[in-house]
């Protein structure tokens, strides 16, 4: 699906931008603890953005379950990386419970991708 190529490219682009912003704009403003959180958010956004690109490239050749995997990864980025960016910038922990939800969405998304691929290949 073209939407996952677009979402993947946008997330990869944003991960590069937020990584550069963190390295050059936030390094003197955030403690090491919160810089580490910021870096984790950018890293996971990049990995899963690349995953979205792959899903976009293969989605026309496999089952509809691949689309589910794409949406799970996308919302995983929103919840996981989004809550970590918020935490790093504000030090407000109120969204801390959302971060693991994003992680679970990542795990389920990758699992759905494996299952969809096995069904298609089988």
Curated annotation (Swiss-Prot):
Keywords, alphabetical: Cell membrane, Membrane, Transmembrane, Transmembrane helix
Entries under Pfam families matching the protein: DUF423
Protein topology in the membrane: Multi-pass membrane protein
Subcellular location per the Swiss-Prot or TrEMBL entry: Cell membrane
Taxonomic superkingdom: Bacteria
Residues spanning the signal sequence: none
Regions crossing the membrane: 3-23, 46-66, 69-89, 98-118
One GO cellular component term: plasma membrane
Major place of residence: membrane
InterPro entries to which the protein is assigned, alphabetical: DUF423
PANTHER family reported in the protein's UniProt record: TRANSMEMBRANE PROTEIN 256
Homology family: Belongs to the UPF0382 family.
Name by which UniProt lists this protein: UPF0382 membrane protein SE_0353
Source organism of the structure: Staphylococcus epidermidis (strain ATCC 12228 / FDA PCI 1200)
